[in-house]
């Protein structure tokens, strides 16, 4: 789940691996659909109310210990000022600078897709 603003992407330090950067997001609860989970997680973690989103990419990634499913959405419009409610370090980074940071392996393909599609210009 990417927050995009003025050609920059909102990222935060990982909850479980402090040296890894992540896009905001979380797990879908049993009673939720993906969009409800997205809105809940962003309100809980980043303090914003999502007003407009666009589906971007679905990824299944297999780590040695587990298989994960990731749904990436682009948040085009929101209410509130994004910050880390849970107190994790966060940054607004230009897409061209993301490769210099450590991200989970599962996120590499979405970073490449954002760059390839010039998303930050299309969706700002």
Swiss-Prot record:
Motif placement: Nudix box: 26-47
Cofactors required: Mg(2+)
Record keywords: DNA damage, DNA repair, DNA replication, Hydrolase, Magnesium, Metal-binding, Mutator protein
EC number: 3.6.1.55
Highest taxon of source: Bacteria
Alphabetical list of PROSITE patterns matching this protein: NUDIX (PS51462), NUDIX_BOX (PS00893)
Reactions the enzyme catalyzes: 8-oxo-dGTP + H2O = 8-oxo-dGMP + diphosphate + H(+); 8-oxo-GTP + H2O = 8-oxo-GMP + diphosphate + H(+)
Pfam families noted in UniProt: NUDIX (PF00293)
InterPro entries, per the entry: MutT-like, NUDIX_hydrolase-like_dom_sf, NUDIX_hydrolase_CS, NUDIX_hydrolase_dom
Function: Specifically hydrolyzes both 8-oxo-deoxyguanosine triphosphate (8-oxo-dGTP) and 8-oxo-guanosine triphosphate (8-oxo-GTP) to the related monophosphates, thereby cleaning up the nucleotide pools and preventing misincorporation of 8-oxoGua into DNA and RNA. It prevents replicational errors by removing an oxidatively damaged form of guanine (8-oxo-dGTP) from DNA and the nucleotide pool. 8-oxo-dGTP can be inserted opposite dA and dC residues of template DNA with almost equal efficiency thus leading to A.T to G.C transversions.
Family: Belongs to the Nudix hydrolase family.
Protein name: 8-oxo-dGTP diphosphatase
């Amino acid at each position: 789940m990417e927050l995009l603003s003025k050609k920059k992407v909102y990222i935060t330090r990982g909850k479980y691996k402090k040296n890894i950067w992540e896009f905001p997001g979380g797990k879908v609860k049993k009673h939720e659909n993906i969009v409800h989970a997205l809105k809940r997680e962003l309100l809980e973690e980043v303090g914003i109310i999502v007003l407009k989103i666009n589906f971007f990419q679905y990824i299944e990634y297999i780590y040695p210990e587990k298989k994960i499913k990731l749904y990436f959405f682009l948040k085009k419009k929101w209410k509130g000022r994004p910050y880390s409610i849970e107190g994790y370090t966060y940054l607004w980074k230009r897409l061209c600078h993301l490769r210099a940071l450590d991200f989970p392996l599962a996120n590499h393909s979405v970073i490449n897709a954002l760059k390839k599609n010039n998303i930050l210009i299309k969706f700002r």
